[in-house]
Swiss-Prot record:
Domain Kazal-like: 24-87, 88-152, 153-207
Organism, as annotated: Dromaius novaehollandiae (Emu)
SMART domains associated with the record: KAZAL
Designated name of the protein: Ovomucoid
Site positions per UniProt: Reactive bond 3: L169, E170
Amino acid sequence: MTMASVLVLLSLVLCCFPDTAFGVEVDCSKYPNTTNEDGKEVLLCPKILNPICGSDGVTYSNDCLLCAYNIEYGANVSKDHDGECKEAVPIDCSKYANATNEEGKEVPLCTKILSPVCGTDGVTYSNECLLCAHNIEQGTSVGKKYDGECKKEFATVDCSDYPKPVCSLEYMPLCGSDSKTYNNKCDFCNAVVESNGTLTLGHFGKC
């Protein structure tokens, strides 16, 4: 099997908005592996579509591709449940009273009541109203993953070998601290170097 074929197999990761973060371990030892040109272990995953939802809220095409993602990014994602991840929880921002800020823009009048929610950007908001306010002020469309604080990713991305002049087309998305989705590690690390290290990992998967 060529290296290109391996990259294609590893790129069959489908994404959706994150959900919950507890799951069961997947037995990755049953999948064959090989070594790529950089001397790194990669898994040879089948193209079988049997989607699972990872504990990071990302939908993987099958168990093997979740394992491949863990190896590639040094993550420890487990399986939350079989099937695709659920969509973000809808929120009704119209129920909050509005006021006009200094810029003449209408923004919700939010209380200081602490009732944290986790946004689809991986950021914890003190309450649902403040998530709505963030969307209006920043022009974003962040949804609510679930009630409660976001469960943090402890994995990091090693960008010491970057930048690189050309990145592959493999799709293993990462969400940067700038709320931008990067197609793969190479795209993300090139951006990290360009930002002089100010860009960090928000979470694995699409923003």
